Amino acid sequence: ALAIYYGGTIAMVVVVALTILFLIRSNIRYRRKMKAEHDDVFKGMMTSRDKAEVWTLLRRHMTESLMASVTFAESTFRQITDGLLKEDIKSLRKAERALGGEKDLLKRVRRRQMLAMRRIDRNLALEKNTWFHTASNASEQLYYCLKRLCEPCKEHVGNNFNPMPKVYLREFLPIRTRIFNLMVEIRRMMEQNDYSDIQNVL
């Protein structure tokens, strides 16, 4: 606080830059840690000869994958809608690139989980087959919904169409907040493995 008071604008810029750098580094470390843990789970699924253990690891892998999909959807939904509201084409292009990477990731994850499904008890695999494909399709639908949202927003801003009238903004902003809060709540339930309030969420 004293540095900002005596240093003025330059000190404030330095503090903001350091804060942003710290947040970026923390985010990168967290992603690396999650990726390493995710890879360890996959290795465990592929090396274990205990079918019950493979099933336990597969459930964990799928839960982590779904949580990652919801987290990605949260941030990308915010990025797309911010880009539309602020007429920020760079933000929309960044979201579009991120969606391209997410599509490839979903394909890799699904292939890995299909391999693990072949290593669990056959009767259990038949029983859980619908559950498995429903979970995979949920992640894909999140991706396609975001893609379909991003394309017209990018076209609208990129072609310099008129900004949204304020009357539309007043209608859109509460809906945006509800959708974002829904995704946050779903992720919380998955993280805590607590689905007792699922009916109220739905």
Segment roles from a protein language model:
Residues A1-Y6, M12-L202:
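Cytosolic, long alpha-helical scaffolding segments
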